[in-house]
Curated annotation (Swiss-Prot):
Gene this protein is translated from: tpm
Protein family (similarity comment): Belongs to the class I-like SAM-binding methyltransferase superfamily. TPMT family.
Binding-site positions, S-adenosyl-L-methionine: 10, 45, 66, 123
UniProt-recorded name of the protein: Thiopurine S-methyltransferase
Enzyme Commission code(s) on record: 2.1.1.67
């Protein structure tokens, strides 16, 4: 999946993946991670997610990473947050008191960039990637994040043969294999097919949204 795909989605405002409220799995399961106030939290492929504001409001330092400059601009503009923009290696870094977002390719992240990240939150990153990129992405998190990192991951599971992603189906077995160096605990699972007309039209019979706690 090429960067041009996502740039076009943002340019055309085809951003059905953007949620207009804070994610309930984040609110329900993040506190149990027990991260210290002031801890830095990585939010990969963050878009302009409201979840970053929620994390900041809980006292965390948020580091989002996003390919689309349009998404980054929209985040700071829509919330009236003044941002200082500088260059940080391969990334254009946008900083405010509440949230920092690096505009660029998530695969360009280095271990030193994430050395002080104690948490990771993924609601729409893993499921945005096709299989070969998911494998690279999970390996990246395992290799670049500190060993004591903890996080929350949200996925979808459905019959991929019936409809193309994104969002892609990421079965439980793939999550556990990709995060083999982590303790993976499913903390919630919900059948959401009745709220997903696109999937019903495609003949999908089950669409399960899962939330996982990741620790190591």
């Amino acid at each position: 999946m090429e960067p041009a795909f996502w740039h076009k989605r943002w340019a055309d405002n085809q951003i059905g993946f953007h949620q207009l409220q804070v994610n309930p799995y984040l609110q329900a399961h993040w506190p149990a991670l027990g991260l210290a106030p002031g801890a830095r939290v990585l939010v990969p492929l963050c878009g302009k997610s409201l979840d970053m504001l929620w994390l900041a409001a809980q006292g965390y330092r948020v580091l989002g990473v996003e390919l689309s400059r349009r998404a980054v601009e929209d985040f700071f503009t829509e919330h009236g947050l003044p941002a200082q923009v500088t260059q940080h290696g391969a990334f254009e870094a946008w900083r405010s008191d509440e949230v920092e977002i690096w505009c660029g390719d998530v695969f360009a992240l280095r271990a030193e960039d994430l050395a002080d990240c104690a948490g990771v939150y993924d609601r729409a990153a893993l499921i945005a990637l096709p299989p070969e990129m998911r494998e690279r992405y999970m390996a990246l998190l395992g290799a670049k994040l500190p060993t004591a990192c903890r996080g929350v991951l949200v996925t979808l599971d459905y019959d991929q043969a019936l409809i193309d992603g994104p969002p892609f189906s990421v079965p439980d077995a793939e999550v556990r294999a990709g995060f083999s160096g982590w303790q993976v605990d499913e903390v919630e699972g919900l059948e959401i097919l009745e709220d997903s007309p696109k999937f019903i039209k495609a003949g999908v019979s089950s669409l399960v949204e899962r939330a996982y706690r990741l620790t190591r």
